[in-house]
């Protein structure tokens, strides 16, 4: 898999002038409202950049590829599997509930909340679509934690939310295979998880319609993807 990286800003651009390629650094991460940045950047070591080692290429979900029947436990403690969503367009994204960075998991959940609202405006379409937020932190994201998080991001404490949007976590042993399939990189680090972003639209036939790497996509794009996939089914 390609090297994993999370982008950080600095308030004082002058702190970057003392850095060079290959430097290891330590810094304070400051998170405030909808923004985050680094302060007190210090060089802790240096190693010349090395070429990437040879290895197998990362798997990238391709349109038309059938998604394996991965299994999870949802926010209600029920076992669910990918296959049971066949017949509906399934929108999938990855999060962990403790993520503090606004541009990462909180953005994915905010975007999915908007998609949930938009699809809900069309009764026929809402019945043909389903949203799935998958945690890659199964040790911490228990069913109760996922349930509380779901109510928070959905803006509702009605269990009816879960009829169209579920929050799930896999068994820890299954997580590497699931993450690899969806090209999700993650690494526990300093009590948090450094990770990439991965979002997919899966057709009613259980095959990939479209895969989005990163977090630059907008809710209307996925709403259109879901609508088009649902209409093709008719």
Question: Where are the regions a protein language model picked out?
Answer:
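Thiol-/selenol-based redox modules, centered on thioredoxin-like
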Residues: 43, 117, 174-234
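Structural microenvironment flanking redox-active thiols in thiol-disulfide oxidoreductases
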Residues: 107-177
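Short, flexible, surface-exposed loop segments at domain boundaries
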Residues: 16-62
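Short active-site neighborhood of thiol/selenol oxidoreductases, capturing the structured segment around
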Residues: 80-111, 131-132
